[in-house]
Amino acid sequence: MQDKIMKFLAYDGKISVVCTSTTELVEEARKIHDLSPVATAAFGRLLTISAIMGNEMKSAKDKLTVQMKGNGPLGTMLVTADNFPRVKGYVANPVVDLPLNDMGKLDVGGAIGNAGFINVIKDIGLKEPYVGICPLISGEIAEDFAEYFAKSEQKNTAVALGVLVDKDGVKSAGGYIITPMPDATDEEISKIEQSIFKAGAISKMLDKNMTLLEIAKSVTGDENVKLIEENITPEYECDCSKEHMEDGLATLDKDVLKEMIEEDGKAELVCHFCNKKYEFSKEELEDILEKNKNN
């Protein structure tokens, strides 16, 4: 299935459902960062929820930054997204390897840790960006974001995220968020809770080649869900360039630039988000230093 985000309404418009498949996106990230299986599962979940949240923003100029920092060996994960959504990110320790957890699954919670925080920054063109911080609950990511939505955005939201990894890479990845509107009844919410439990893991549903419409019906228990938006394709895309890297070098102290020129005679910069390398010759560094002197 092609990566896609689809939006639905269930129970006559009283329940909002957003479903996404992100298998290709997560596999691309795995290759770029050479991620271990557990790092793939963790980073894939964060990329998926960030793609959903990024797409919820209104303007093409809006930007989302999501940082997740726990006390586990994975360290900090950071993802940025726009409303397209184009996402990119990095993992502090991409090669972390842990034994399977008690359920025989990749130990995402152990890799991230259960002490730490989620930091969400939304730059939506106001004077100051919106910042929401929420402590981690389990490190499993979906539970942590359900807590974030409840505490920071005052939305009771069911969140499911999953990445299925085998020896060849990512078999399936995706997620969904379900948000009741104020007029949703307790009976409808209860039916959804039961349906979510019965439906099982999102990664398993995608691996069975279920469509996003079928998944939306399955997790809500409503056969009459209404599709309201489709043809949204999340992508892993980095906008780095040599010009951006040069801007970064230009912010360095003059003495640091002089040291690079005198000791190394060149510089190599690597983009955190896509691992692309940029080479700067001695002459280019001298030009940057000269511009610095004139500023």
Predicted regions and their residues:
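Interaction interfaces in information-processing and related assembly proteins
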Residues: 1-229
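Cys/His-clustered metal-coordination modules, chiefly Zn-binding fingers
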Residues: 197-295
